[in-house]
């Protein structure tokens, strides 16, 4: 299937920036879902010419893992800050197509609107799939924030060019915060709440943590010639 692929084609720097700016105007910044039954975690791993995309599906209330979708592809786009979705988007779409259970919301290892043009990977892919999405990054990309209190649940907003674009959220006592920004069809405060509810034992939310673990395992198995 080739649906959605046109949203990830490189068109030269100026045209690609223009595409990001156009799509960012279509991002919905409020909650557009009713019940969360299933929640997905999205991550990729790459080495050399190969990239693996993983989507984990968990029951939201219990965080029970019920499905893992894997896609393997050749890397056809260099790593360029601010254009991560063009590199990772196609393999994530392949993983999405294979899912038997489509989640009510996706959490990405990356940015939502906390992006120079307000279209990080969570916003870009959330829009293309028309699915509520959250960006949860390990590092800040744009803006500034005040360090939140050391206790789990504390957060401080991230500001960029006079706008609130995300929040630094403490998901574990005395551990570096994660950087949360809404992706699409969800508010920032709801995004923060969901990240805290899905971050149980670790700094990283469980859906994304599992996606990261499986993407590394899959990539290593492929390189070593072993079955996943």
From Swiss-Prot:
EC main group: hydrolase
UniProt entry tagged with the keyword Nuclease: yes
Annotated site, Interaction with target DNA, chain positions: 79
Assigned keywords, A-Z: Cytoplasm, DNA damage, DNA repair, Endonuclease, Hydrolase, Magnesium, Metal-binding, Nuclease
Pfam families per record: Endonuclease_5
Enzyme Commission numbers on file: 3.1.21.7
Any single GO BP term: DNA repair
Coiled coil regions in record: none
Gene Ontology CC annotation, any one: cytoplasm
A Gene Ontology molecular function term of the record: deoxyribonuclease V activity
Keyword Repressor in annotation: no
Binding site for Mg(2+): 43, 109
CC cofactor: Mg(2+)
Subcellular location: Cytoplasm
The reaction(s) this protein catalyses: Endonucleolytic cleavage at apurinic or apyrimidinic sites to products with a 5'-phosphate
Gene3D superfamilies the UniProt entry points to: archaeoglobus fulgidus dsm 4304 superfamily
Family: Belongs to the endonuclease V family.
HAMAP family in the record: Endonuclease_5
Classification via PANTHER family: ENDONUCLEASE V (PTHR28511:SF1)
Biological function: DNA repair enzyme involved in the repair of deaminated bases. Selectively cleaves double-stranded DNA at the second phosphodiester bond 3' to a deoxyinosine leaving behind the intact lesion on the nicked DNA.
Name under which the protein is recorded: Endonuclease V
């Amino acid at each position: 299937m080739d649906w959605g692929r046109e949203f990830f084609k490189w068109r030269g720097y100026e045209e690609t920036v223009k595409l990001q700016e156009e799509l960012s105007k279509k991002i919905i910044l409020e909650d557009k879902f009713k019940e969360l039954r299933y929640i997905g975690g999205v991550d990729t791993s790459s080495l050399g010419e190969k990239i693996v995309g993983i989507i984990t599906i968990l029951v939201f209330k219990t965080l029970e893992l019920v499905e893992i979708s894997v896609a393997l592809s050749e890397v056809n786009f260099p790593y360029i800050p601010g254009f991560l979705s063009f590199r990772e988007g196609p393999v994530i779409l392949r993983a999405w197509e294979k899912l038997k259970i489509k989640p009510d919301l996706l959490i990405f290892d990356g940015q939502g609107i906390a992006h120079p043009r307000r279209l990080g990977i969570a916003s870009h892919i959330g829009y293309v799939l028309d699915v509520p999405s959250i960006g949860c990054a390990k590092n800040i990309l744009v803006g500034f924030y005040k360090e939140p209190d050391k206790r789990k649940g504390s957060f401080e907003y991230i500001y960029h060019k006079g706008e609130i674009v995300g929040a630094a959220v403490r998901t574990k006592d005395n551990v570096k915060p994660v950087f949360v920004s809404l992706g699409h069809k969800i508010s920032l405060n709801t995004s923060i709440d969901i990240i805290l509810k899905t971050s149980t034992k670790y700094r990283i939310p469980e859906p994304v943590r599992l996606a990261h673990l499986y993407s590394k395992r899959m990539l290593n198995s492929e390189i070593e010639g072993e079955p996943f």
